[in-house]
Each structure stands twice: as structure tokens, then as C-alpha cells.
Amino acid sequence: MRFQKTTEYAIRVMVYLAERADERFSVNALHTALNIPYKYLGRLMNQLAQKGLVTVAQGKFGGYTVEKKSLASTYLYQIVDAVEGLEDYDRCILGFLKCSDEHPCALHHLWLGIRKQIKDMLYSTTLADLVQTEHKTNGES
């Protein structure tokens, strides 16, 4: 299982903004930095702003930002929910509508543990965690 493309883009944008918290970026600047299609990115940023995950300022010096104070309280599940919803993380991995503990599909019991790990990760990982991981990965302290 992997994130939908929109969710991948949303997480990339949010981490980029979180690393530069309190700075403003236009859609064009984000498009250039992250190589996300411009028109697609504009719609995505509007979704994130409507959900309160980014703030937007209009005008010549406007743009999108993530406030530093929100990094530790913005969770990965909120980003996923804002763009694709969380329903897929409760559905049958094979797409059966009536799959349950009482009527399991062939992968049901194997998928339960994996699904729990994914959901635990979504609900316990903050933007602050992702920024910290990104800095460690890039050799920064």
C-alpha cells in the first residue's frame, strides 16, 4: 500500500514548509522547489488552507506558510485526511465490502497488523518528527 499521489505531494509540501516554518512561499516557488505540477499544486494548497494546515496571506508579499508553533501539533493523519480521507485505511485490502473479523477475506488477518502499524504511524507522527527525521537523513543536526 502506498499513499495516493495527492497525499504524497501534500506531505512533501508540508515537510518543505515545516522546514522553513514561518516563511511564506508562493505556489510558483513551491512548484519550482518541489517539481509538483503548478495547477495541481494550486488546488492542493487551497485544500490544505481550507483544513487549516497552512496559512495563506494575499498580496505582493503573500504566500503559504506553516507556523512553527503548529509543527508539534500537526499529525500526519491530518494531512492524509485533508486530501484523500482516512476511509481507505479501514477498508479491506482486497476491496471486499463485507470483509470483517467474522467474514474475513484471504488477507484479512495478515492485513490487520499492517493496517494497525500504518494507522499508528499516521496518528503518532507530527510535522516536527518529520522535520527532525529529514535533518538527520541529510546529515544536519
What are these language model-derived features?
Residues 75, 90-141:
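C-terminal regulatory/oligomerization modules of transcriptional regulators
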